[in-house]
Amino acid sequence: MSDIAERVKKIVAEHLGVEPEKVTESASFIDDLGADSLDTVELVMAFEEAFNCEIPDDAAETILTVGDAIKFLEKNAA
């Protein structure tokens, strides 16, 4: 697992208060991890801060799973 993947999973587990083992790449923030729309906005902000990058709104709307976040950040993180 990449360093980015590990960091994303840790951020998600901490922000959503879920067990780390539930945070898999296929896990949907809303359907599987119990996030609401505000949680997803806060996660995007946490990713931006942790990875020192900007996630445009149109890209943020496509980040629905842990794997989506990892793929985006692997391509775009500083």
Curated annotation (Swiss-Prot):
Family: Belongs to the acyl carrier protein (ACP) family.
Processing and modification events after translation: 4'-phosphopantetheine is transferred from CoA to a specific serine of apo-ACP by AcpS. This modification is essential for activity because fatty acids are bound in thioester linkage to the sulfhydryl of the prosthetic group.
Name of the protein: Acyl carrier protein
Species this chain originates from: Xanthobacter autotrophicus (strain ATCC BAA-1158 / Py2)
Role noted for this protein: Carrier of the growing fatty acid chain in fatty acid biosynthesis.
Residue list for modification O-(pantetheine 4'-phosphoryl)serine: S37
A Gene Ontology biological process term: lipid A biosynthetic process
Localization (cell): Cytoplasm
Keywords assigned by UniProt, alphabetized: Cytoplasm, Fatty acid biosynthesis, Fatty acid metabolism, Lipid biosynthesis, Lipid metabolism, Phosphopantetheine, Phosphoprotein
Main location: cytoplasm
Signal peptide: none
Highest taxon of the lineage: Bacteria
NCBIfam families linked to this entry: acyl_carrier, PRK00982.1-2, PRK00982.1-3, PRK00982.1-4, PRK00982.1-5
Domain Carrier positions: 2-77
Gene name of the record: acpP
UniProt KW Iron-sulfur keyword: no
GO molecular function: acyl binding; acyl carrier activity
Keyword Hydrolase: no
Pathway linked to the protein: Lipid metabolism; fatty acid biosynthesis
GO CC terms: cytosol; membrane
